[in-house]
């Protein structure tokens, strides 16, 4: 197996502080963006029944990690995408227009090409929101992007105050060009 140092990555924090920083980052970003976009947390599945079709194959070539559940007489797949599942969850949780969900997906993508940003194991934060037909336009999309960038910058600012070692990285700006 390759280590991060083999891939040209040099961490700013030790291993334990990296875990603490990741946990804090997740909590801060969830709270900040969740409040700004009216999102609520929903737990994501670790696996889905293969027959449901909810495990989106992203670009058509991913092979799911599959296993049988003998007592249930069913086959399951470890998730590698929540695209379809999120839309079903919006319906099942009875979200309304202007509301949405965020979730933290833990997945296995067996066919992933590995590098500094990609791993076979995926811990991915994701969100989905119901918008009105009148909001399906470029202005609404641009405002949503500005909100996301602002939440990212606010999260980074707080994270850097807790972990000063991260100040070696450039701060995120809040200006967005389209």
Regions found by a protein language model. Give the residues of each.
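A generic structural motif
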Residues: 13-17, 126-137
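Short, flexible loop/turn elements at secondary-structure junctions
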Residues: 48-50, 82, 106-109, 131-133
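N-terminal "assembly arms/tails" that initiate or stabilize quaternary assembly
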Residues: 11-90
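Broad gene-expression machinery/nucleic-acid interaction feature
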Residues: 62-64, 73-75, 101-103, 122-126
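Long, well-ordered alpha-helical scaffolding segments within enzyme catalytic domains
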Residues: 138-157
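Short, small-residue-biased leader/transition segments that mark boundaries at the very start
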Residues: 1-4
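Alpha-helical scaffold segments that mediate packing/assembly in large oligomeric complexes
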Residues: 153-178
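Conserved alpha/beta core surface patches that mediate binding of polyanionic ligands
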Residues: 83-123
């Amino acid at each position: 197996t390759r280590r991060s140092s083999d891939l040209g990555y040099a961490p700013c924090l030790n291993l334990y502080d990296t875990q603490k920083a990741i946990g804090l980052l997740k909590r801060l970003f969830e709270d900040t963006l969740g409040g700004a976009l009216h999102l609520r947390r929903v737990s994501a599945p670790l696996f889905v029944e293969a027959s449901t079709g909810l495990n989106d194959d992203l670009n058509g070539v991913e092979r799911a990690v599959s296993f049988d559940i003998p007592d249930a007489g069913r086959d399951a797949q470890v998730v590698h995408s929540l695209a379809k599942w999120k839309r079903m969850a919006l319906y099942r949780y009875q979200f309304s227009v202007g509301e949405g969900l965020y979730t933290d997906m833990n997945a296995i993508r067996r066919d992933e090409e590995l590098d500094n940003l990609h791993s076979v194991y995926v811990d991915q934060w994701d969100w989905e929101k119901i918008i009105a037909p009148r909001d399906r336009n470029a202005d609404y999309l641009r405002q949503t992007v500005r909100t996301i960038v602002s939440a990212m910058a606010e999260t980074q600012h707080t994270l850097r105050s807790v972990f000063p070692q991260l100040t070696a990285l450039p701060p995120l700006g809040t200006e967005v060009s389209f």
